[in-house]
Amino acid sequence: MGEPARWQRRVEEFVLGQIGDSPTRVLEVGCGEGELALALARAGHSVTAIDPRAPEGPIFRRARIEEFTDPGQFDHVVASLSLHHVEDLSMALDNIADLLRPGGTLIVVEFAWDRIDEAMAEWALDRLPAASPSEKPSWLGRCCRGWTRGGEGGSHYHGDDAEAHFAGWAGEEGLHNSRQVRAELERHLVERHFEWVPYLYPDLGDGVSESDESAAIESGTINATGFRYVGTRRALAEP
């Protein structure tokens, strides 16, 4: 199993661990190609998966979370790498809170691009697989190689600082940063679980594992750029 597949398996394990074994009603926001939604359905849950480009299939609907409606409420809402993409984050979380039953949970897996500093970018750059003309480079490869130019003797020349470079990329992509995402989560829900986790290793070379990135995080060499969050819907009387 390659690292991208292992990362997806970790996400599935985390989400299923939060949901439990009893069949529940689950909404996935930003389902992409549908791997996680299908895994949840195979586990016995009643799944509705939305995305503006959702695939065909009975559990999938092409919709944006800001406008999505449903006649019922959900036991769980799952958002894996989708909240930083939504156009109106506050509106999206307003709707998610309304779609959750009282006591229902929002389960989030997210990317904190704003925690990529120079040390993080250098660490990733040194571990990127060699560029191949026959393969489309990953987002990380494009960003890191766009930040640096080869210098004499194999040295690197950086046109700007890493934070500014990645902020420029995120601005072009319309991405929210992790501080914005966490602030809106705090405003709409009650936090039950939060942890920083490795995120970059699936896009690095074959020899770089989750444990390698974890060790670099634990030693203070690099920042963690992934996080997991679980929150419950606020009671109507709560501020």
Question: What spans do the regions from the language model cover?
Answer:
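Substrate-binding/catalytic lobe of Class I Rossmann-like enzymes that use SAM or dcSAM, i.e.
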Residues: P137-G207
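Class I SAM-dependent methyltransferase SAM/SAH-binding core
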Residues: G32-E67
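Conserved class I S-adenosyl-L-methionine
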Residues: T24-G32, I107-R142, G150
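C-terminal lobe and adjacent flexible extensions of AdoMet/dcAdoMet transferase-like proteins
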Residues: H188-P239
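A short glycine-rich, Lys/Arg-flanked "PGG" loop and its adjoining helix->strand segment in the class I
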Residues: M91-P102
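Conserved alpha-helix/loop element of class I SAM-dependent methyltransferases that forms part
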Residues: A5-S22
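A conserved beta-strand element that flanks and buttresses the S-adenosyl-L-methionine
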Residues: V78
